[in-house]
């Protein structure tokens, strides 16, 4: 294999990755489809209206639960990312021109689906003067204008930690500002060459300093050790991260990073317990957890925990 699905020549790293066959999944990597009434209604509506969600297009295993809770995730910024992470199925390349009408369409999709909570994520747009900050912020504004009772979680790239670009995004006031570090420092450069670990932590700190609820994600199975996971959890908590999700890496294709280990569910239980003990307000860990999984419930849990802490400290909520 020397050509990627999008027609470009494979990178040397991708050629090396492809030498390792796709791994066989362990028995605990499976889901049961529970198609409740809310899920069935949303499924029919999405098909009828021609709407697009990450949930369907990425084949997320949690779609049945999330749609039953009226939660969904949308991808903005196009189908090409200006950076390449070795675990990510989104293609790298020159993106299409900025679609300034996209925020309106996403907001209308949220309205049509009657969502209680929406997650918006997107590609890195280093080709744009503002890194795509306007697009992310405007999408939040449009959703809130059309859906005042819908929560919005915004999962952003790092915008190179540019203060002006970050401020433009923060001013849109999503319920949760998420930025995923994804892996531990020792293998970070190998897995995410376009990002920097400390820079990602700085983005989370900036969001927390702005007064936003913050969130991040760790993907296990790419070469880290359990001890490194705990150290990364400390780094995230010290940076001001309120919510963390921890998941198993599932390889999208042979050209992506091989799975180094299948993390047993018991280890996820240990990590969730540890993250809670060191002070995270919201934690979810498991083989099939994804960063947007049960996002609305995690946000509500975090707000309730913050309020309880304020009351116990004698503060006025």
UniProtKB/Swiss-Prot annotation:
Q: Provide the transmembrane region boundaries.
A: none
Source taxon at top rank = Bacteria
Co-factor(s): [4Fe-4S] cluster
* Gene Ontology cellular-component annotations: cytoplasm
Q: Which InterPro entries match?
A: Aldolase_TIM (IPR013785), Elp3/MiaA/NifB-like_rSAM (IPR006638), LIAS_N (IPR031691), Lipoyl_synth (IPR003698), rSAM (IPR007197)
- What is its pathway? Protein modification; protein lipoylation via endogenous pathway; protein N(6)-(lipoyl)lysine from octanoyl-[acyl-carrier-protein]: step 2/2
MF (Gene Ontology): 4 iron, 4 sulfur cluster binding; lipoate synthase activity; metal ion binding
Q: Which Gene3D superfamilies match?
A: Aldolase class I
**Protein name in UniProt:** Lipoyl synthase
From which organism does this entry originate? Answer: Mycolicibacterium gilvum (strain PYR-GCK)
Gene from which this protein is expressed: lipA
